[in-house]
Amino acid sequence: MNSTPKAVVIFSGGQDSTTCLFQAIQEFGVENVEVVTFQYGQRHAIELEKAAWIAKDLGVKQTLIDTSVIKAITSNAMMEEREIKQEGNTPNTFVDGRNALFLLYTAIYAKGQGIRTIFTGVCETDFSGYPDCRDVFVKSMNVTLNLAMDYNFNIRTPLMYLTKKQTWALADKLGAFDYIRQHTHTCYLGVEGGCHTCPSCVLREKGLNEYLSEKTSGQKYV
């Protein structure tokens, strides 16, 4: 197999995964980076459309994996037309097992391609109550996959301890601020450009406004 180090990014076309994609490209070179996108039964096609467009625009190979069978065994507001709200300790947008499934399938694909490094944009700081965005989960999954496949994966989480403000700052540092602001999709309701009211849009815009405010006042990102 080719000995050149390569990386694969779990890619949705959103702010976080696109930031990770630019990070991977900076570290590994665009020719050594691939993305994996999942069709898991999400409510809106715009997510998949954005992911495909960005991958093509940046010149990275995209592999689309269908995991929509998950719709038959779990229920949530990400895959069904219902009101988005908090249910107990977890919002009803949480998809049980989604990140575990994404990491498993990406690892299977990566091993077949001789790739060891997997980037995912999960974040514990602004994780919205999703248990599978925690560092302890990702680390345990890394160990599990290594043992399950007898292969040394390295799951990278560049955004794990960043706030949304800091994620915007990282995008700026990577030279991708305008690109990510213009081309990525985050809205839970599937509105082009954002609905400005769903939890995901509110978090994204709050972080953006905080970063722009600090940037114009001359404060530096640490």
From Swiss-Prot:
<dbReference type="InterPro" id="IPR014729">
    <property type="entry name" value="Rossmann-like_a/b/a_fold"/>
</dbReference>
<dbReference type="GO" id="GO:0008270">
    <property type="term" value="F:zinc ion binding"/>
</dbReference>
<dbReference type="GO" id="GO:0016879">
    <property type="term" value="F:ligase activity, forming carbon-nitrogen bonds"/>
</dbReference>
<feature type="binding site">
    <location>
        <begin position="11"/>
        <end position="21"/>
    </location>
    <ligand>
        <name>ATP</name>
    </ligand>
</feature>
<feature type="binding site">
    <location>
        <position position="195"/>
    </location>
    <ligand>
        <name>Zn(2+)</name>
    </ligand>
</feature>
<keyword id="KW-0479">Metal-binding</keyword>
<dbReference type="Pfam" id="PF06508">
    <property type="entry name" value="QueC"/>
</dbReference>
<comment type="similarity">
    <text>Belongs to the QueC family.</text>
</comment>
<keyword id="KW-0547">Nucleotide-binding</keyword>
<protein>
    <recommendedName>
        <fullName>7-cyano-7-deazaguanine synthase</fullName>
        <ecNumber>6.3.4.20</ecNumber>
    </recommendedName>
</protein>
<feature type="binding site">
    <location>
        <position position="187"/>
    </location>
    <ligand>
        <name>Zn(2+)</name>
    </ligand>
</feature>
<dbReference type="InterPro" id="IPR018317">
    <property type="entry name" value="QueC"/>
</dbReference>
<dbReference type="GO" id="GO:0008616">
    <property type="term" value="P:queuosine biosynthetic process"/>
</dbReference>
<keyword id="KW-0671">Queuosine biosynthesis</keyword>
<dbReference type="GO" id="GO:0005524">
    <property type="term" value="F:ATP binding"/>
</dbReference>
<comment type="pathway">
    <text>Purine metabolism; 7-cyano-7-deazaguanine biosynthesis.</text>
</comment>
<keyword id="KW-0436">Ligase</keyword>
<feature type="binding site">
    <location>
        <position position="198"/>
    </location>
    <ligand>
        <name>Zn(2+)</name>
    </ligand>
</feature>
<keyword id="KW-0067">ATP-binding</keyword>
<comment type="function">
    <text>Catalyzes the ATP-dependent conversion of 7-carboxy-7-deazaguanine (CDG) to 7-cyano-7-deazaguanine (preQ(0)).</text>
</comment>
<feature type="binding site">
    <location>
        <position position="201"/>
    </location>
    <ligand>
        <name>Zn(2+)</name>
    </ligand>
</feature>
<keyword id="KW-0862">Zinc</keyword>
